[in-house]
């Protein structure tokens, strides 16, 4: 299994096939997990689960039951509240939610809407459906069970 990191965004999960026909699970990036960064693609994360199985005969090791579990790093801001030195609204109430449990009500108060003080980013829909669409496109739908 290869687990990459750093780009702050969910990246594809795929099987790579070696010269000898062996399969390796490759996860290019799981995202940030916990952050208060400002855009949808930076607050949707991947918790990947899988089983490492060693056969009784021959000791062959395989990776099975791979599942991608999207989570949202939720935070809130106060529209008229304090800002930091870069004029970003201060964030609070940071929590992780499984995307399957995330609601439109939570989307409506997510701090990404108010991240630049009074400026509201309108170019990116921040809805449960758009979070699912982004996650499936970024990670690949193969391992998303819902």
Regions found by a protein language model. Name each.
Residues 1-48:
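Conserved beta-sheet core of the metallophosphoesterase superfamily
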Residues 43, 47-146:
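A short C-terminal boundary segment appended to hydrolase-like catalytic domains
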């Amino acid at each position: 299994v290869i687990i990459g990191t750093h780009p702050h965004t969910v990246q594809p999960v795929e099987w790579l096939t070696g010269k000898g026909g062996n399969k390796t699970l490759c996860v290019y990036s799981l995202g940030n997990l916990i952050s208060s960064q400002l855009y949808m693609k930076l607050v949707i994360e991947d918790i990947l689960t899988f089983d490492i199985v060693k056969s009784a005969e021959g000791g062959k090791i395989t990776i099975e039951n791979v599942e991608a579990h999207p989570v949202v790093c939720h935070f809130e801001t106060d529209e008229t509240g304090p800002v930091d030195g870069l004029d970003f609204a201060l964030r609070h109430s940071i929590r992780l939610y499984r995307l399957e449990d995330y609601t439109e009500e939570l989307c409506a108060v997510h701090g990404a809407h108010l991240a630049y003080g009074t400026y509201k980013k309108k170019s990116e829909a921040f809805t449960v459906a758009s979070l699912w669409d982004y996650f499936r496109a970024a990670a690949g739908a193969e391992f998303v069970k819902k």
